[in-house]
Amino acid sequence: MLYFGECVLVYSKIVCNGLWFVYNVAMDRKQLTKQLNNQTLIIWDNLCELYSPLTKYNPPIIEINGRIYRTAGRCHQEDNLIHMGYKFFLYSKEFYNNMFNIILPHEIIHQADYNLFGLSEATCGHGKKWQEIMINYGLSPDKHHNMWIK
């Protein structure tokens, strides 16, 4: 991976007819953050339709963290902040899509759970209330992702 200001040049491998090819993808961190924040607003609005008390809260702030390697995302409920693992966006198109469609809502729902029910043993983490919100949002309440970066 090479850094050029706000852009990152990523070298990845693809297989075509059994042959490995190397291709590079330029990913602008600012543009990615903007896309994540736009998607966050959509997800938050959908959650507010399901749970009207959420309308009195601001959607969480999204930050990209290049130091997260195993965790795709991490919600810091008391700070209304979500860190997303940058490497997962760069690894493959499938991981990129999973980060937007599964991991981002998963982390936002942690914030919604905290805003609705507070921080307690019953609601913290992947408790029953969080699972209920995930299901009502249309996602499987999985605790872990299956995206492994080598």
Where are these regions (language model features)?
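Walker B catalytic acidic pair
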Residues: E107
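Active-site-proximal or metal-binding-adjacent scaffold patches in catalytic folds
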Residues: F4-I102, Q111-K150
